[in-house]
From Swiss-Prot:
The lineage of its organism: Eukaryota, Metazoa, Chordata, Craniata, Vertebrata. GO terms for cellular component: cell-cell junction; cytosol; plasma membrane raft; TCR signalosome. This is Lymphocyte cytosolic protein 2. Adapter protein primarily involved in signaling pathways within T-cells, as well as other immune cells such as platelets, mast cells, and natural killer (NK) cells. Plays a crucial role for transducing signal from the T-cell receptor (TCR) after antigen recognition leading to T-cell activation. Mechanistically, once phosphorylated by the kinase ZAP70, mediates interactions with the guanine-nucleotide exchange factor VAV1, the adapter protein NCK and the kinase ITK. GO terms for biological process: mast cell activation; T cell receptor signaling pathway. The modification Phosphoserine is found at S207, S210, S376, S410. Residues 151-172, 340-354 have a biased composition (Polar residues).
Length: 533
């Protein structure tokens, strides 16, 4: 649609829903007319159509209506250049625009509105001409009368009177006061022309009044700045000696405001550093105690602390394997000595170990050295608890292990007691997995030496479950001389020996956690031993 046939944006903004409906009736958009009346869409709303508003019109008309709305907005933009300038003399338009010739300029109005006369409905033409005669005539005349306002400068001077205050300055600078004040301070004005120019747009009426005060104050400020610069080096010189920390407390008093924060901050840093080593030092003494313990235990055994713990055990275990029922004497003494920690872990040993404690309280002193006697547990179960107090009280076999093997071959110590169907001493992880997969049943397990082979991580328990091999560390705690299974984060179950761990989880399910998938939780008992394969 040509812009000549499109009404101006200013007109459409003033339309109500009835005027917009009449316009659509004029364009033969009966369906749009109904939508406008139904939803009460006025001209301003039509020019700023939203997605919700345009959906209210028929779908076939939506492209045409959006194009029409754009054309109306563009039609006003072309005339906006002329309408901006006459906004100031609008007060004069009411008095002068009607006095000017309407004959020549009415032809321009006809030129702009003649396309509207071509519309089929004559009634609508009257509707469009009536606002043009009253409102649009003023805008068009003002737009086209740009030369006449230049001729009517005498009439417009009343509205431009505020800028006449510039003549009072009698100088090229707008912000300058009378010449008398300027002459008093000739050197200062050239220094301050740039900062004085910005206040001009804020208010020209007050421009001659506001600058004189800063002009009088500026020299005083500049003088103050010069005087302030003189003590400034004295302050810097005074701050130089306090940089020495030895003189800092003496210099703090004259410079309380500016100097206390830096000195107060600096000592705070070393104080924090002094506290840091204090926090780190406490763990060091226990480490020294550990070395002292190792040195004290050195003459007894040359290996790590878990090994001397087995120093007495291997003798008894070898004897137990040869003749379990013939040597019951050393067996009851060991569980009875370590019963302080054992009852909290397993049910069977705890029920039988609690009895000797009441009868033999003094046996705990020897239990700290050797208490990992897993192979001796089956004979305990075969024997009654009543046999233990007399056997322990006799104490015949207690000194035997110490003189016979005070320092036996340490590797053989742990191999012989653990050399059962589920223990393999030196084997790699792939070989151990192959041994487990030979049986290939859930609950297949074995115990092998850890690749680290340290005092804290001596063994590894490998379990096959659902075609996946789980490696669980068997840790040794030197302080309490007990074995722990896993990381100990999920719970703390300590055992006197590795055999106790195997015996316990043969009856109780073992929690298996996948390192890659922490959400998986499986439980199984140790059923099939793969150590002899």
């Amino acid at each position: 649609m040509a812009l000549k046939n499109v009404p101006f944006r200013s007109e459409v903004l003033a339309w109500n829903s009835d005027n917009l409906a009449d316009y659509f009736r004029k364009l033969n958009y009966r369906d749009c007319e109904k939508a406008v009346k139904k939803y009460h869409i006025d001209g301003a709303r039509f020019l700023n159509l939203t997605e919700n508003d345009i959906q209210k019109f028929p779908k076939l008309r939506m492209p045409l209506l959006s194009k029409l709305s754009q054309d109306i907005n563009k039609n006003e933009e072309r005339r906006s250049i002329f309408t901006r300038k006459p906004q100031i003399p609008r007060f004069l338009e009411e008095t002068e625009s009607h006095e000017e010739d309407d004959g020549g300029w009415s032809s321009f109005e006809d030129d702009y509105e003649s396309p509207n006369d071509d519309d089929p409905d004559g009634e609508d033409d009257g509707d469009y001409e009536s606002p043009n005669e009253e409102e649009q005539a003023l805008v068009d005349d003002a737009a086209d009368y740009e030369p006449p306002p230049s001729n009517n400068e005498e009439a417009l001077q009343s509205s431009i009177l505020p800028p006449n205050s510039f003549h009072n300055t009698n100088s090229m600078y707008i912000d300058r006061p009378p010449t008398g004040k300027v002459s008093q301070q000739p050197p200062v004005p050239p220094l301050r022309p740039k900062p004085a120019l910005p206040p001009l747009p804020t208010g020209r009426n007050h421009s001659p009044l506001s600058p004189p005060h800063p002009n009088h104050e500026e020299p005083s400020r500049s003088g103050n700045n010069k005087t302030a610069k003189l003590p400034a080096p004295s302050i810097d010189r005074s701050t130089k000696p306090p940089l020495d920390r030895s003189l800092a407390p003496l210099d703090r008093e004259p410079f309380i405001l500016g100097k206390k924060p830096p000195f107060s901050d600096k000592p705070s840093a070393p104080l924090g550093r002094e506290h840091l080593p204090k926090i780190q030092k406490p763990p060091l003494p226990p480490a020294m105690d550990r070395h002292e313990r190792n040195e004290r235990l050195g003459p007894v055994t040359t290996r790590k602390p878990p090994v001397p713990r087995h120093g007495r055990g291997p003798d008894r275990r070898e004897n137990d394997e040869d003749d379990v029922h013939q040597r019951p004497l050393p067996q009851p003494s060991l569980p009875s000595m370590s019963s302080n920690t054992f009852p909290s872990r397993s049910v069977q040993p705890s029920s039988k170990n609690t009895f000797p404690l009441a009868h033999m309280p003094g046996a705990f002193s020897e239990s700290n050295i050797g208490f990992q006697q897993s192979a001796s547990l089956p004979p305990y179960f075969s024997q009654g608890p009543g046999n233990r107090p007399p056997l322990r009280s006799e104490g015949r076999n207690l000194p035997l292990p110490v003189p016979n093997r005070p320092q036996p071959p340490s590797p053989g110590e742990e191999e012989t007691p653990l050399d059962e169907e589920w223990y393999v001493s030196y084997i790699t992880r792939p070989e151990a997995e192959a041994a487990l997969r030979k049986i290939n049943q859930d609950g297949t397990f074995l115990v092998r030496d850890s690749s680290k082979k340290t005092a804290n991580n001596p063994y590894v328990l490998m379990v096959l479950y659902k075609d996946k091999v789980y490696n669980i560390q068997i840790r040794y705690q030197e302080e309490s001389q007990v074995y722990l299974l896993g990381t100990g984060l999920r719970g703390k179950e300590d055992f006197l020996s590795v055999s106790d761990i195997i015996d316990y989880f043969r009856k109780m399910p073992l929690l298996l956690i996948d390192g890659k998938n922490r959400g998986s939780r499986y439980q199984c008992t140790l059923t099939h031993a793969a150590g002899c394969l």
